[in-house]
């Protein structure tokens, strides 16, 4: 930032997962999920926003989770945090639209990452990280007059 004094692109890609149920939700676990899955993105975005405003073609790409669009009875705290992330993302997009700062969100389903280590899950059937990267690249390559608000990505057979 010192060298260039502006930023054209911010990608928020974060996540911590937990298994829990609504009927026995631990408040501390929920706070932890919100801190990681929501507040870290808010804090980073607020820190970088003055630099994004200096560019005439800025974008923020927030990578959330399909669990921000649905619910999972086995991952309540995670689902709550990702729903909150989506609400913040939608509000941010509408706020920054007038400043011509694009805010797009990607909501992937199961992605083949190390979080699936030792689970026995069929990782070849999951979304591959390269596919997410291609979607991000496509969003970046769009003209400054085109805004893709949301992209939902699902595995074919997981």
Can you annotate each of these PLM segments?
Residues 65:
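Residue(s) in the substrate-gating loop at a strand-loop-helix junction
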Residues 45, 81:
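Active-site helix of classical SDR
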Residues 13-18:
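Conserved NAD(P)H cofactor-binding loop of Rossmann-fold oxidoreductase domains
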Residues 70, 91-101:
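Active-site-adjacent segment of SDR/Rossmann-fold oxidoreductases
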Residues 23, 72-76:
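Active-site loop immediately N-terminal to the catalytic Tyr-X3-Lys motif
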Residues 21-22, 26-31:
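Substrate-binding pocket helix/loop in short-chain dehydrogenase/reductase
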Residues 105-106, 121-158:
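C-terminal helical subdomain
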């Amino acid at each position: 930032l010192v060298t260039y004094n502006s930023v054209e692109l911010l990608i928020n890609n974060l996540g911590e997962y937990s298994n829990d149920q609504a009927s026995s939700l631990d408040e501390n676990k929920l706070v932890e999920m919100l801190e990681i899955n929501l507040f870290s993105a808010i804090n980073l975005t607020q820190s970088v926003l003055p630099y994004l405003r200096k560019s005439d073609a800025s974008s923020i790409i927030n990578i959330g989770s399909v669990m921000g669009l649905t619910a999972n009875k086995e991952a309540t705290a995670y689902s709550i945090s990702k729903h909150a992330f989506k609400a913040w993302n939608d509000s941010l997009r509408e706020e920054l639209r007038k400043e011509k700062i694009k805010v797009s969100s990607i909501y992937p389903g199961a992605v083949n990452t190390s979080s699936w280590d030792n689970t026995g899950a069929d990782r070849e059937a999951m979304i591959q990280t390269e596919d997410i990267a291609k979607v991000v690249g496509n969003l970046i390559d769009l003209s400054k007059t085109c805004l893709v608000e949301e992209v939902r990505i699902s595995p074919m057979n997981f």
